[in-house]
């Protein structure tokens, strides 16, 4: 195709390359535990999920798994891609939840929330991490509602 006829807005290569270049241009890092949500534009997470799905299908093929005839693995690539982007690494691709604080009305003791279930992944081996967390704070000038602890823990995990 004549280069002059190409649409200038169509990105070259996979969406992951476009996002990666955007982050590199900003001078920020994108390590496994970093939140990169500010660099993902509307509609790109869906494209990234499709890309991961294609690569997951290739991985299953390389593992010599018959995803066409084995009913257990039909559509597994789609399910795994969705799980990795929306759940396991969800805090990487979504902004931190909004946390509203309120004036402390003189409460001086520690208050806690837990157990809060944690499902995460080790950034070194991609091994599942499953457990519970308890969060406790001694309030100062401001306090937050107990439900916010769950949101923060789930985002960070």
Report residues per predicted region:
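Active-site loop/lid in soluble adenylation, ligation, and acyl-transfer enzymes
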Residues: 2-132
């Amino acid at each position: 195709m004549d280069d002059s006829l190409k649409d200038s807005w169509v990105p070259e290569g996979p969406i992951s390359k476009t996002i990666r270049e955007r982050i590199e241009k900003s001078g920020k890092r994108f390590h496994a535990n970093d939140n990169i949500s500010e660099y993902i534009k509307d509609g790109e997470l869906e494209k990234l999920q499709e890309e991961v799905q294609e690569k997951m299908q290739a991985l299953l093929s390389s593992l010599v798994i018959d995803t066409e005839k084995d009913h257990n693995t039909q559509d597994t690539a789609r399910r795994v891609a969705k799980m990795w982007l929306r759940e396991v690494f969800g805090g990487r691709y979504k902004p931190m939840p909004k946390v509203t604080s309120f004036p402390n009305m003189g409460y001086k003791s520690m208050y806690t929330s837990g157990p809060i279930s944690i499902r995460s992944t080790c950034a070194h081996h991609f091994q599942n991490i499953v457990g519970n967390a308890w969060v406790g704070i001694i309030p100062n000038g401001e306090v937050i509602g107990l439900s916010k602890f769950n949101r923060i823990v789930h985002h960070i995990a």
